[in-house]
């Protein structure tokens, strides 16, 4: 019997399509029942069309159930994935503009500080509603996978107060993993005196680099980095400072790496708003 996976907030093109690709890459899930729901009919229809096209192009038999009725989508679901942005971009704009009026310059404002708190106040009541629906209509052992921000707040609320088994997920680890592979490639060839274009140049891909990460959403760290049987964690600072692109684009991440010894999964700007000293004054923000 095939399992059912429901997406709430499926009108989020980037996240929904990326997650569908991940799901369909797992052989055991290629016969899953997929249900999409969203309150925005236009976005829901657009994303459904694109994802169905991806499915058909790969010769799979899945037909996406697309509905504006959340209860229909989650009925009998084994997994429910939350991708919602409560309040939409209009509310997100206020999360940035209101704090800025009082001198709080956030980069994204979706996790902590004033913006994160306002975002959480909108999201927590809604995710608790989702939990109530899941308990009533989904399978009894349904797992809620939360991709929405503020991730830690929403996941905590669903797990502790919603009474539904919940995990929080984010794509940040993969992005930094690619950067780390590039840095190791630079170091490996530099150690051997090999230049790009030489016939014995060594290319390093993500699949070649094994990582262990620890932390919470938007505060996660690569605490162990293994390539070719060796631990490269302590050489990350050297590599990032040498990299011709990353040393310019990842100044905050490199500074944090220098201070604390671990590279962060978060983007440069995102990381800058989680500590106290990068965004205190406009001229300092420009520096980083």
Feature-to-residue mapping (PLM):
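Glycine-/small-residue-rich beta-strand-loop submotif within the FAD-binding core of flavoenzymes
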Residues: 101-109
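Long, compositionally biased stretches enriched for glycine and/or charged residues
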Residues: 184, 188-288
């Amino acid at each position: 019997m095939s399992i059912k996976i429901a997406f709430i907030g499926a009108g989020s093109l980037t996240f929904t399509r990326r997650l569908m690709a991940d799901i369909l890459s797992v052989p055991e899930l290629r016969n899953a029942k997929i249900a999409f729901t969203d309150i925005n009919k236009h976005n829901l229809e657009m994303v459904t069309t694109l994802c169905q096209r991806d499915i058909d192009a790969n010769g799979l038999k899945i037909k996406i159930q697309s509905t504006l009725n959340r209860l229909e989508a989650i009925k009998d679901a084994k997994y429910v994935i939350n991708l919602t942005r409560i309040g939409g971009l209009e509310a997100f704009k206020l999360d940035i503009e209101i704090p800025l009026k009082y001198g709080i310059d956030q980069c994204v404002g979706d996790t902590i500080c004033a913006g994160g708190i306002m975002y959480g106040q909108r999201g927590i009541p809604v995710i608790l509603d989702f939990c109530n629906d899941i308990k009533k209509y989904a399978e009894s052992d349904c797992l809620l996978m939360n991709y929405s921000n503020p991730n830690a707040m929403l996941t905590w609320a669903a797990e502790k107060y919603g009474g539904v088994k919940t995990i929080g997920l984010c794509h940040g680890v993969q992005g930094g993993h690619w950067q780390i592979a590039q840095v190791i490639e630079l170091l490996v060839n530099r150690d051997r005196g090999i230049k790009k274009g030489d016939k014995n140049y060594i290319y390093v891909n993500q699949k070649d680099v094994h990582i262990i990460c620890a932390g919470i959403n938007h505060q996660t760290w690569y605490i162990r980095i293994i390539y070719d049987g060796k631990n490269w964690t302590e050489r990350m600072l050297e590599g990032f400072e040498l990299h011709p692109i990353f040393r310019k684009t990842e100044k905050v991440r490199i500074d944090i790496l220098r201070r604390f010894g671990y590279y962060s999964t978060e983007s440069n700007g995102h990381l800058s708003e989680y500590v106290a000293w990068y965004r205190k004054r406009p001229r300092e923000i420009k520096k980083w």
